[in-house]
Amino acid sequence: GELGIRQAARAGAGKVVVVTGHEAERLEAFLAELARRSGIAIEPARVADWSVPNGYSVMAGAARIAGDYLLMMADHIFEASILQRLAQQGGPTRGVTLAIDRRVTSELVDPDDATWVALREDGFIRAIGKGLEAYDAVDCGAFLATPQLAEAIEAAIRDGAPGSLSNGMQRLADAGRAATMDIGEAWWLDVDEPRFHAMAEDQAPLHLPEIFGS
């Protein structure tokens, strides 16, 4: 969490909105202290029912932001170049731009938890989801979003979808407005279980010298 906030600020974010749910009071107290300590403007947005799909968190956060924004999964860590490049990816044909990694067999990717991405010839998204059998890349968990993303999630819910972020992404993909940015050789990690937590402790200081001061 703190790493992601510091990275977003270094990528140029003027304000960081953190969506809270489980143990919200404890997290919000930590965020207030971090804001004082770091000088970063941090605003919590609480989702009352944290059991709902993650698209509801996107809508809650987007409601507090005017215009485009970097969207990051709280348990992901990114090399600085990923977010800095992603912040520059906007364009009139894009409702969202997703950072993707074509190294789908990397030891840093958890195949049991990954969200897979199938691409069109122009690099825009054709399909996205955890259950894809044919895919070209893995979703890195970092997006440059426009207001269209939250609108797409809301529209998907109206049409009967559960309300996941991928529901909204697929809707934008179907409209030809879900772009991608290939991260190339850059480093990132989804810290969702103990072995990846150990990898993060081992590798993050090497890849994030601006945070760890090495």
Explain the meaning of each model-derived region:
Residues 1-69:
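Conserved N-terminal catalytic core of the sugar/cofactor nucleotidyltransferase
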Residues 20, 73, 100-101:
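Short beta-strand/turn micro-motifs composed of small residues
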Residues 33-36, 61-63, 87-90, 114-119, ...:
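Short, hinge-like loop/turn segments at secondary-structure boundaries
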Residues 41-43, 124, 177-179:
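Conserved beta-strand segments of alpha/beta enzyme cores
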Residues 49-53, 104-106, 187-189:
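A short acidic, often aromatic-flanked loop/helix-cap motif at beta-alpha or helix-coil junctions
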Residues 67-77:
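Short beta-strand-to-loop acidic/aromatic patch adjacent to the donor-nucleotide binding site
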Residues 79-159:
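Conserved core of the sugar-phosphate nucleotidyltransferase
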Residues 134-214:
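Conserved alpha/beta core of the MobA/IspD/sugar-nucleotide pyrophosphorylase nucleotidyltransferase superfamily
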